[in-house]
Amino acid sequence: MGSRHHLYPHGTGGFLYLVAIIDWYSRYVLSWRLSNTLDADFCVEALEEALRKGRPDIFNTDQGSQFTGEAFTGLLRQHGVRISMDGKGRYSDNLFIERLWRTVKYEEVYLKAYQNGRDARVGIGDYFRFYNAQRPHQALGYRTPAQVFISIPMEATHGGMVESLTVDTMTTNYLRTAEPSLNIASILSK
């Protein structure tokens, strides 16, 4: 699901925008970027990183200009990914992303007084590493996103495709391929 999320780094007087790409099934954050502008570049960079970790069958996002522009949609088409977009103003079409944003805000952003963009980038990066590797989820049977992401069996796929993935600016939907060449150790070290 693609939706912009505004983060106010106290002390800078400006807004920062966060995009994240997550696996719906495991809630694993595959990639994320922070920007002080709403241009598409930071969203495309996050998508490029996520695509290096696997190719989804379907990518679902909202209709924000970052996600409807040629740079973003062209990259998806280039990789043979089908594009799906939610209805305008339909935040409930991607509850997993909305839940991620709530969690990030209440467990990280609102508790910190970022002095600048660098502080926000470091804090959010640390939080996503914690979120993936250490934060259990009730919906995942009290396992972490990393535990579930790594344990997705090939038998659970159809045609080599895992059942789900998502991305959003604060996240956009993304389905990934379970490729044998996928190096889980390199994903967890990011």
Regions found by a protein language model. Give the residues of each.
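Charged DNA-binding/catalytic regions of mobile-element recombinases
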Residues: M1-K190
